């Protein structure tokens, strides 16, 4: 929403799989008159396939499919800027793997912590909110073999998913 509100020349595609989140996006788009935002009710990366070539992507949730999403984005544009928010330990652990698996430049991972001050008697005490991790980088076309790292990371992710489902295949 924020990016769509910055300029009418920017076109935003919001891919969302949860029906209640799609409805909220629609209400906000109408309320804020965001005619430059298209909402796609789909699961990523499948929802990305038919979209125009992106220049930037913000990933606010991956449903456990971060590497698949990034591979699709890389295939569409190996020069795009990526920003990923992470709150779960599983995604946080994946962020360093992402920076190692894909050919990137200016990769950075940072963590933000927010506190709210609550009054307790005559004291004002900070109450910590959950931290948010932010990973940002720009894809670059990799030297020979860099996509092998991506494929290896995807295979490892698939094997891990199969183990969780009790479907270990050798």
Regions found by a protein language model. Give the residues of each.
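Short helix-capping segments at alpha-helix termini
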Residues: 8, 30-35, 101-106
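Short beta-strand element of Class I
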Residues: 10-13
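C-terminal substrate-binding/active-site "lid" region of AdoMet-derived donor-dependent transferases
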Residues: 75, 79-128
């Amino acid at each position: 929403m924020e990016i769509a509100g910055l300029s009418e020349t920017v076109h935003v595609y919001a891919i969302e799989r949860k029906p209640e989140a799609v409805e909220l996006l629609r209400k906000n788009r109408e309320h804020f008159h965001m005619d430059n935002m298209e909402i796609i009710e789909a699961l990523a990366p499948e929802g990305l396939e038919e979209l125009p070539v992106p220049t930037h992507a913000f990933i606010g949730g991956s449903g456990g499919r971060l590497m698949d999403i990034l591979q699709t984005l890389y295939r569409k544009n190996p020069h795009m800027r990526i920003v990923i928010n992470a709150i779960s330990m599983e995604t946080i652990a994946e962020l360093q793997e992402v920076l190692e698996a894909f050919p990137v430049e200016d990769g950075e991972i940072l963590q933000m912590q927010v506190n709210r001050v609550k009054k307790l008697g005559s004291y004002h005490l900070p109450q910590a909110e959950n931290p948010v991790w932010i990973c940002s980088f720009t894809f670059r076309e990799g030297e020979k073999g860099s996509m092998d790292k991506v494929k290896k990371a995807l295979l490892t992710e698939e094997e891990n998913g199969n183990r969780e489902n009790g479907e270990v295949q050798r």
